[in-house]
């Protein structure tokens, strides 16, 4: 659990809680596009994302334990459908400061012209998917047991924090 993932280079930098949540939303989107994008036009990835204490990631060595402290919950990733009306209200125009999203190229091109009655596809975690007020329908689950912290660990191993 405490295995060193990556010793950051001298120019690596601190990541704030906000930056981490934006990055996780982007990683959700990448997973969605890579695994479901051939069959679905995915608008965005993200949802309700919140880090836990210590909230931020300091420059220096990063272990899996560090990431587990930041993102401790075992929320699987889900491809969901949502009406245009709820997509706008709950994700695009939300006033909830805990919702973070990353738009696909397709999503960025249509986000200002969403049809309330159309169906759209998004990639979120199981917490966001199962939160009833979001009114999402789960279409498919990504590999069980892959969580936000795992996506961050893979990103770091690939040199994404340099």
Listing of model-derived features with the role each one plays in the protein:
Residues 1, 5-23:
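A conserved active-site cap/scaffold subdomain adjacent to cofactor or substrate pockets
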Residues 18, 22-162:
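Feature captures C-terminal
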